Amino acid sequence: MFVGSPSAIEKPLSLSSKTKVGDETEFTEDALRGSSLVPTGILNGDDECHALHMSPQAIHSQAGKAESDGLPTYASVEKSTTPIGRLLSNLNGGLASAPPKVGFGFPRYYALRIEDLPRDLTPREFLCTFLFATNVVSVELNPVSVDNEVAHGLAVFSSRDAAASARDTLLSSDVYSACSMIILDNYRKGSQTNLSDETEGSESSVSFNRLSRNHSPTRPLLGNRDLFRRSSNHVSASMPTANHSESAYRHSKTPLGDSTFQAPNNGGSLHSDRLWSSFPVSYPLTLANVLAKDEVGSPTWSPTPSKSSTNLRQDGVPPILRFNSLSINTNVARNYLSSEKGYSAHTQNSSAQSPHPRVFSANSAFSTTSPPPLTPSTSRDYPFSASTISPSTPFSAYSSSHGIHQRIPASTPTNTNPADQNPPCNTIYVGNLPPSTSEEELKVLFSTQVGYKRLCFRTKGNGPMCFVEFENIPYAMEALKNLQGVCLSSSIKGGIRLSFSKNPLGVRSSSSSHNNHNGNVRNLHSGSMNNYNTDSLLNHTGGHNEVHASPSWGNNLMYGK
């Protein structure tokens, strides 16, 4: 801003011009009177108007810089103690205190444009490519879309040497060797990159902060997830094992092969250290943890996998398995002790290692997990009341020649009581049968299974009971797996429950009939059914034994009596 009128001064000083000013230019009192910016009344008196003059030394020095940079210059105003001098100093404001060099240019950046990228490359993977590069300002990826037939990326550097070094390194890899790379000098878009603490984590453009060689960054990256909170002294203690890292690296489905990045080995060294040798290793974060999306689950995610999460991934057993011992009377988990050291201990271990255990959810609804592989530990389930069935329970149709039966996948909890676990045999006990069950319907259902031999059905006061015999044990195991949880046409309290019988059909156990009867009565009070013998249903002559306790699943609570 300058003071003066074009009518009073022949050649006014233009701020946007590059014209040099002479040795000394003074604004006289007559010139100031013609100015529309300064009232004429303030000039009356003995004010020393000649105190305001241009500084030739400052002008010459600034004019020389303006010619070299192509930028406008400003003249400084000498301070004065007179009223007009103070007024003009205020009017000129920042011009008197302007720095010698005033520029409107941006810092120079160099962009590495990479074309013909893999079509399935994600912004996260493209960013991790330059994770250990130096002088990186921003990384952008334009994936394949309707407008872009070929994916291309852009990495902005603050120096050309860093861009050239990154280009040479990428061309030597197997993934980027087929890509075309161009270095763009004086990249102006780099001035608009986000260098503040708030970075944008979008899928099309990912910007991250400048990586320093002397400190570990703690700013948010990729959707405000704090990935670099831990210092470098936690590398050895928090580094996951080689097997776990390689597994997470494979699950990330990254197209970046082993030539670019590898999971850390037991020694904790990274192959990327050789790739970007100029960047110091000050991050405990491994590439496998960055790319494994299941690892980043919360904003406060830590790159160190917890012991519990590692065990869950290795064993595949969720903590909800403890609900398997729910009681039908109290709905409270009861502790059980194994009194058998032989087969029961083996079945407990096999139950703990089952990758898809049949669980009973805490909200009394059915779980939708797939049925587990057939093991003795999952062959018998606890009963449940009708109130535990959710109205929105998904059912799957099971077709047969007789009609369509509904099947509940993983609908019943696993019974882990050692007293209810019988070894596999060729006879299956059918439990949870409604009072109006038809023998013909059961025959039609089980006759569809391979190896079906015969069926023994008996109706007692507490409900029907049924045993199905197959040609051999494998056929019985296959039928148990296929028909477990199938709903009959008259089912009201869930599907049928299948389990192995204590002894084959028609074969009497070594114990006497009286002892078996007493044991069956005790099992009724404990809610167990697997200890019922088929010899109590059939005598030696093949007829039914009249002295027999009903093999219902519990007591009168089963049918609401």
UniProtKB/Swiss-Prot annotation:
Protein location: Cytoplasm
Q: Which GO terms describe its molecular function?
A: mRNA binding
Biased composition annotated in UniProt, kind: Low complexity:
298-310, 390-401
| Signal peptide feature range | none
**Do the record's keywords include Transferase?**
no
CDD domains xrefs: RRM_scw1_like
The record's annotation in SMART domains points to: RRM (SM00360)
What's one Pfam family the UniProt record gives for this protein? Answer: RRM_1
Q: Which residues carry the post-translational modification Phosphothreonine, per the record?
A: T193, T218
- Record-linked InterPro entries: Nucleotide-bd_a/b_plait_sf, RBD_domain_sf, RRM_dom
GO BP annotation list: mRNA processing
Q: Which UniProt keywords apply?
A: Cytoplasm, Phosphoprotein, RNA-binding
Q: Where is the RRM domain?
A: 426-503
Q: Where, per the database record, does this protein carry Phosphoserine?
A: S191, S196, S216, S231, S298, S302, S325, S370
Going by the entry's taxonomy, the superkingdom of the source organism is recorded as Eukaryota
* Listed Polar residues bias regions: 192-217, 233-246, 345-354, 409-424
A GO CC term attached to the entry: cytoplasm
Q: Where is this region: Disordered?
A: 192-259, 295-316, 344-424
Q: What role does it play?
A: Acts as a negative regulator of cell wall and septum deposition.
Name this polypeptide is given: Cell wall integrity protein scw1
Species name for this entry? Schizosaccharomyces pombe (strain 972 / ATCC 24843)
List the top taxonomic levels of the source: Eukaryota, Fungi, Dikarya, Ascomycota, Taphrinomycotina
